[in-house]
């Protein structure tokens, strides 16, 4: 075996230099044989592969074409002529003779800007174009020395979520070479298409453009242009791009799409893009909407406003020869068909536009006269009760024979009275005669008018009113839409809130014996279609329709909900309610016995009956918190109920003293007396051990040196004051609770329909009467109930718990799950914890809050005389987890389980058309009697006005509907007085008498020395939220939906700004 010599670094360096010389010699030999050297290959690290292990002498192929049967690499130098000839025809051709060595020439290629440039071969790129070629430009299939006419400059888009609404526009050369090859991992390499022909994008945009991504979110096509949408991440940042795709393959056919999962973005797609795409139609509609709003604002600002008080002077009418009253000629009023009501008015054969001469109060239906002449004897146009009259003012009777009126143009005979009117008198109470109709005192046109009090006589003109027509008033396309009366026929009886409708009246809804009329975008569109030649109607329809179209587009593109189109159709098409003859009427009936309402027939609630199976559950006595105390201007010698008998009530003190887990505390204020056993402060160290040596007591003795002795005023500073407090949970002798279980409950509503009795339940909510069928919306039955019959201080009250208790679950400690004694002497549940007593000064900020659970606060009160002081005691909640207290009963029960939250809905079906009247005045003499925080219904009584049903509301809460006359009902009020009652839109204030909550609430009583207070039941925010969890949940959902819609719109505008001005 030959010996081996170790290789040193110097030997390795020599070997590498020798190999480099050999490679350069091979390159020079290849150049002498007219073979072009390979251009330098610069590819991104993310798309380049490993070239190790490849045969350096064999043909080199691109990584994207590796293993795909392609022997040619068109991304590098073009092949020799023989290979080009072989590619053009399958027949072999003889090889040409070797040419003499020459310098290789770079090929010419298209730049996309009408010229050509040499392709770089060796050395690093010197400009952005050379760098793009080095990154992977593929020349066309034909001769690279010629221009490629198919190459063009196209645009792709990129944007990043991390940079906000910043869009990047990438302009690049694109050759229609078909689908680009795939990499080894099956991904499409976009770097093969990257060859910018515009400004060079930033480096991070180029990196994102060349990032491989196999997920195609959608394929977009416009004309012959095709784009692929992708989203991916680069360095933790999410990017999106729209890449231009080739449209023709190698053989001229349509190029196939990348072999990945693709989808067409539409409403039926299960995958939704993250952004909203706006195109030209949306921008065009938005611009039209802004233009419409601007035009509408300009029209509203330029529209003239009429002065109702002093109308403009009319133009002078043409003279006409008429009857002679002395030496004067009359000027007849020429009333045309285009008056304020759109009717046809005629006086003789003369016509004139009355809207130019009639004053503004014509619209109100009141009296009004307008003089067309300045003479003492002249003609007037009078108006009253929505009728126009032709009147003549005169001082003496006219001739007995009529005179024909002859105009200048032709001779016609005007319509004149058959009988001359009798003379007029100055008295206002006189009349002009039987054949005269409607004329009366003149209304002053101006303040200086001297015709005050003169009687006007004349003849009634013929008035033919056209059919009633409606229009819609727009408010930028948003609800509510108002109905505008264009023409009104009085006999149709259209009213707005009980007031007759006139031309020009605007109202959300009109009511008549024929039915109801409302307005909606559908009606405006119908009017615009029917009046296609009217610019106003077309403009109104456009302004009403465009916002809904935009909302539909936003919802469809942003939310991608399948039901958006159906919901929009329902809103647009189902909001129109044309007037028609109704065959059914709907109203409400309050749920208190005695309530009545008026459908086509009167309906009255005679009573409510409750049916169930009852099982007795026994009786028990609940725990009750009781406290007492005393304020004394000296230290007592005996701190007990017997020793403090002069200051503390004996009976409560003994009951509390004998209770379990009592708390007894004695405080001494300024204990520096000149005599007795309280001379030193050391007597009052914690626990009061020294004090107990002289005064045996069961109370805890504590010093209170920081408190003021001002309660015992009028004494020197060494005055001593003591405070004594005692509290415990006791069995109240006058409070018992009896339990009854109700199963198979059913509520029976007893109704009287036009004198016919009828009972309705949830199983049978119909009443068949001779007048028609009445369907009642009966609330569901409450189900199983638990009744708590509470007796206290001679007053009995029942509370109802919904549902059966789960005695084997969380309700095991509830009163209904205990074994009760028949005599109500057993206390249920565990013994409560000991109350905590606390001495609080009168100016302590702590008094602004409520006592905590199980706490009792005592505060000295200055007396009205010297050495007289009182004590104010405040108690908090019970402060333990047991559920047998009255607080638990009130929190888990209700006073009326079968009382629904709202009135009963009544639907009366009849074959005759119906129209429900409506109250036109506020209710009178309404009185409210009750307690608004006791959980019991209050009594509401008063007088309902005439004119129809009175939907009574008390402080905004509907308490039922009543016919005209006296009504008495019960309502659960949650607000304190004053009470505002309304009916038919008219409101008034009711008188109220509030009952003390102490007499109605089932709560414990706190006893004091001079001041007796009631333990206040305060509701915390958590308790209020627990009681209104459904409303809060619904409100939160609505708020989230609204916030999402606003955020979506904001996002649309944000990214739309970036798309309009890309970088």
UniProtKB/Swiss-Prot annotation:
Glycosylation sites: 353, 371, 410, 429, 658, 759, 791, 1011-1012
Residue numbers spanned by region Functions as E1 signal peptide: 563-582
Region (Human C1QBP/SF2P32-binding) residue spans: 30-69
Annotated phenotype, changing residue 1055 to S: Complete loss of virus production from infected cell
Top-rank taxon, per record: Viruses
Domain commentary: Structural polyprotein: Contains two internal signal peptides that are necessary for directing translocation of the glycoproteins into the lumen of the endoplasmic reticulum.
Result for mutant: residue 1060 to V: No effect on virus production from infected cell
Region feature (Disordered): 1-131
Cytoplasmic side: 556-582, 1050-1063
Protein name: Structural polyprotein
Organism: Rubella virus (strain M33) (RUBV)
């Amino acid at each position: 075996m030959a010996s081996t010599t170790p290789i040193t670094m110097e030997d390795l360096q020599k070997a590498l230099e020798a190999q480099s010389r050999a490679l350069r010699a091979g390159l020079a030999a290849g150049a002498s044989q007219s073979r072009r050297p390979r251009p330098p290959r610069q590819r991104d690290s993310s798309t380049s592969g490993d070239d190790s292990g490849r045969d350096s002498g064999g043909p080199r192929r691109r990584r994207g074409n590796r293993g795909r049967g392609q022997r040619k690499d068109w991304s590098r130098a073009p092949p020799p002529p023989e290979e080009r000839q072989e590619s053009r025809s399958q027949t072999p051709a003889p090889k040409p003779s070797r040419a003499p060595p020459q310098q290789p020439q770079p090929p010419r290629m298209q730049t996309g800007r009408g010229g050509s440039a040499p392709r770089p071969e060796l050395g690093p790129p010197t400009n952005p174009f050379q760098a793009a070629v080095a990154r992977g430009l593929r020349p066309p299939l034909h001769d690279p020395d010629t221009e490629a006419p198919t190459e063009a400059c196209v645009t792709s888009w990129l944007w990043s979520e991390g940079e906000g609404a910043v869009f990047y526009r990438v302009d690049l050369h694109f050759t229609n070479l078909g689908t680009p090859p795939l990499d080894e991992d099956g991904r499409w390499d976009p770097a093969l298409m990257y060859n910018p022909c515009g400004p060079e994008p930033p480096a991070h945009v180029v990196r994102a453009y060349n990032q491989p991504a196999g997920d195609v979110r959608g394929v977009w096509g416009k004309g012959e242009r095709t784009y692929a949408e992708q989203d991916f991440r680069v360095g933790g940042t999410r990017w999106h791009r729209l890449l231009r795709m080739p449209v023709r393959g190698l053989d001229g056919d349509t190029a196939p799409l990348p072999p990945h999962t693709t989808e067409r973005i539409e409403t039926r797609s299960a995958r939704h893009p993250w952004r909203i795409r706006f195109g030209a139609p949306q921008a065009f509609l938005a611009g039209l909407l802004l233009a419409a709003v601007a035009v509408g604002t300009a029209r509203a600002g330029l529209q003239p406003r009429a002065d109702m008080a002093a109308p403009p002077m009319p133009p002078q009418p043409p003279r006409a020869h008429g009857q002679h009253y002395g030496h004067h000629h009359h000027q007849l009023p020429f009333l045309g068909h285009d008056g304020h009501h759109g009717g046809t008015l005629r006086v003789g054969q003369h016509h004139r536009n009355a809207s130019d001469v009639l004053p503004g109060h014509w619209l109100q239906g009141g009296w009004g006269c307008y003089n067309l002449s300045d003479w003492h004897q002249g003609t007037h146009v009078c108006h009253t009760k929505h009728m126009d009259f032709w009147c003549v003012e005169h001082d003496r009777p006219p001739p007995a024979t009529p005179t024909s009126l002859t105009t200048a143009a032709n001779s016609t005979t005007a319509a004149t009275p058959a009988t001359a009117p009798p003379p007029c008198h100055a008295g206002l109470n006189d009349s002009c005669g039987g054949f005269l109709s409607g004329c009366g005192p003149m209304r002053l046109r101006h303040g200086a008018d001297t015709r005050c009090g003169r009687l006007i006589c004349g003849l009634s003109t013929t008035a033919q009113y056209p059919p009633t027509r409606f229009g819609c008033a727009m408010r930028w396309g948003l609800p509510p839409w108002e109905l505008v009366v264009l023409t009104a026929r009085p006999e149709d009886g259209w009213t707005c809130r009980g007031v007759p409708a006139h031309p020009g009246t605007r109202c959300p809804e009109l009511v008549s014996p024929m039915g109801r009329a409302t307005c909606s975008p559908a009606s405006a569109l119908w009017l615009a279609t029917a009046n296609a030649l009217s610019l106003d109607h077309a403009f109104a329809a456009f302004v009403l329709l465009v916002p809904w179209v935009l909302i539909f587009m936003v919802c469809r593109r942003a939310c991608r909900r399948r039901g958006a189109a159906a919901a929009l159709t329902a809103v647009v098409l189902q909001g129109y309610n044309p007037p028609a003859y109704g065959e059914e009427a709907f109203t409400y009936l309050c749920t208190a016995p005695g309530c009545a309402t008026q459908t086509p027939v009167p309906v009255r609630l005679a009573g409510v009956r409750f049916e169930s199976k009852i099982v007795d559950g026994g009786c028990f006595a609940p725990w009750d918190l009781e406290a007492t105390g005393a304020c004394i201007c000296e230290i007592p010698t005996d701190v007990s109920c017997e020793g403090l008998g002069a200051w503390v009530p004996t009976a409560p003190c003994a009951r509390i003293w004998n209770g379990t887990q009592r708390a007894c505390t004695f405080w001494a204020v300024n204990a520096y007396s000149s005599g007795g056993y309280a001379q030193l402060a050391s007597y009052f160290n914690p626990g009061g051990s020294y004090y107990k040596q002289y005064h045996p007591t069961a109370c805890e003795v504590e010093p209170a040196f920081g408190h003021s002795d001002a309660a015992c005023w009028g004494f020197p500073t060494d005055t001593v004051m003591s405070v004594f407090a005692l509290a415990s949970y006791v069995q109240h002798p006058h409070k018992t609770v009896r339990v009854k279980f109700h199963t198979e409950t059913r509520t029976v509503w007893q109704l009287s329909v036009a004198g016919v009795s009828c009972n309705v339940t949830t199983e049978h909510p119909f009443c068949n009467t001779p007048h028609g069928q009445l369907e009642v919306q009966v609330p569901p039955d409450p189900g199983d109930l638990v009744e708590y019959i509470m007796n206290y201080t001679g007053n009995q009250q029942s509370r109802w718990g919904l549902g059966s208790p789960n005695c084997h679950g969380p309700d095991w400690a509830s009163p209904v799950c205990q074994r009760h004694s028949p005599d109500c002497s057993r206390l249920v549940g565990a013994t409560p914890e000991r109350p905590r007593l606390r001495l609080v000064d009168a100016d302590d900020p702590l008094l602004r809050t409520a006592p905590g659970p199980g706490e009792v606060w005592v505060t000295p009160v200055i007396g009205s005389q010297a050495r007289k002081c009182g004590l104010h005691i405040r108690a908090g909640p019970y402060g333990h987890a047991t559920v047998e207290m009255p607080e638990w009963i009130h929190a888990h029960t209700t006073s009326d389980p079968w009382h629904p939250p709202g009135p009963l809905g009544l639907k009366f079906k009849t074959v005759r058309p119906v129209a429900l009247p409506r109250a036109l005045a506020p209710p009178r003499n309404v009185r409210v009697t009750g307690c608004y925080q006791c959980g019991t219904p209050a009594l509401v009584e008063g007088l309902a006005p005439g004119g129809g049903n009175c939907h009574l509301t008390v402080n905004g809460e509907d308490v039922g509907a009543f016919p005209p006359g006296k009504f008495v009902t019960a309502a659960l009020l949650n607000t304190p007085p004053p009470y505002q009652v309304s009916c038919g839109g008219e409101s008034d204030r009711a008188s109220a008498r509030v009952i003390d909550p102490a007499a109605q609430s089932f709560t414990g009583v706190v006893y004091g020395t001079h001041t007796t207070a009631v333990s206040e039941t305060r509701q915390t925010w958590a308790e209020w939220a627990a009681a209104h969890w459904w409303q809060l949940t619904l409100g939160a959902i609505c708020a989230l939906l609204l916030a999402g819609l606003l955020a979506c719109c904001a996002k649309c505008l944000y990214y739309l700004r970036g798309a309009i001005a890309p970088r």
